[in-house]
UniProtKB/Swiss-Prot annotation:
Cross-referenced InterPro entries: Rep
Family, per entry: Belongs to the Gram-positive plasmids replication protein type 1 family.
Binding site for DNA: 229
Organism: Lentilactobacillus hilgardii
Name this protein carries in UniProt: Protein rep
Any Pfam family matching the protein: Rep_1
Known role: Produces a single-strand nick in a specific site of the plasmid, and this nick results in single-strand replication by rolling circle mechanism.
Alphabetically ordered keywords of this record: DNA replication, Plasmid
GO annotation terms (biological process): DNA replication
Length: 314
């Protein structure tokens, strides 16, 4: 009797991409092996066996597996992004309950491209600068809370574009007058000062509006942008092995010890109030699928078949 291929479907009937992420994970693990990273075997074993509970309608919920938690692992990053997005939406909902008149802004902060050699230094510099930015008088007087994430994109010439996405929660007085409102040019000058740059950096700021009548509102879109992958898998797995190996080596070293996402002000306080723990500690329970399995009728075990390149039910 042939084994069935795993099919794990979300609440909105979209199949979860276990196979795609595992194939990417194996390619990443192979690059680590070639580069002589000690964690290569550990990464390869990520998510080999998935244990689910199922109800009488066949709905699955992951309850046990082992994730490598490597920063660039496509399988872990997929779970991590879901968990971060889920946590962030909880924080935003609570923030709006506590400060109903608060408004949201989406701020993107950039700097000149970095080489692989100085990427780590530039990422750390941005982390220090953003704390300084929000201590300046004009941003601080209306800022209630924020969440920021660092994203790295890879340029065709082998350099890296490091930038930050910041979701700000501000008092309504931010929009009152020129003494409170900070336009894009001012944000650029403030960021230049915080980063100690000899050029004016490109920044983008826009008000975030919740318009549920038009489907996905801009607050949800901004939250998802903030909580997304630090580095997209397609940027490090291009089938150009020489190029990919250099990128993996640069990013492994450049991102070591850095925080992908962090909270400040009211958002940080709310995370403590909600007792939200580090997402990496809970890559199993990250789903935003609220369908509760009321009656577990069986366990479903799926194992990765290295020959057939897929998960099969055992």
């Amino acid at each position: 009797m042939s084994k069935k291929i795993l099919k794990d479907v979300s609440r909105n009937r979209k199949e979860r991409p276990w196979r795609e992420r595992k194939l990417e994970n194996l390619q990443y693990a192979e690059y680590l092996r070639i580069l002589n990273f000690k964690k290569a075997n550990r990464v390869k074993e990520c998510g080999e066996v998935l244990r689910f509970v199922a109800d009488d309608e066949g709905r699955l919920r992951l309850y046990q597996t082992w994730f490598c938690k490597s920063r660039l692992c496509p399988l872990c990053n997929w779970r991590r992004s879901m968990g971060q997005s889920n946590q962030l939406m909880q924080v935003l909902d609570e923030a709006h309950k506590q400060r109903k008149t608060g408004r949201f802004l989406f701020l993107t902060l950039t700097a000149e491209n970095a080489s692989g050699e100085n990427l780590k230094q530039e990422v750390r510099k941005m982390g220090r600068a953003i704390s300084k930015l929000f201590q300046y008088k004009k941003p601080a007087k209306n800022l209630l809370g924020y969440v920021r994430s660092t994203e790295i994109t890879i340029n065709k010439n082998g350099t890296y574009h490091q930038h930050m996405h910041v979701l700000l929660f501000v008092k309504p007085t931010y929009f009152k007058d020129s003494a409170n409102y900070i336009n894009q040019a001012e944000w650029s000058k403030l960021w230049q000062r915080a980063m100690k740059l000899d050029y004016q950096p490109i920044v983008n700021v826009e008000a975030v509006r919740s318009n549920k009548a038009k489907g996905k509102n801009s607050l949800i879109a901004s939250a998802q942008e903030t909580a997304k992958y630090q580095v997209k898998s397609k940027d490090i797995l291009t089938n150009d092995q020489e190029r990919d190996l250099q990128v993996v080596e640069d990013l492994e070293q450049g991102l070591a010890g850095s925080r992908q996402i962090s909270y400040g002000g009211l958002f940080k306080e709310i995370r403590k109030q909600l007792q939200l723990e580090d997402v990496d500690a809970h890559l199993i329970n990250v789903d935003d699928d609220k369908v509760k399995i009321d009656e577990v009728v069986r366990e479903v075990v799926a194992k990765w078949d290295y020959n057939k390149q897929n998960y099969f039910i055992w």
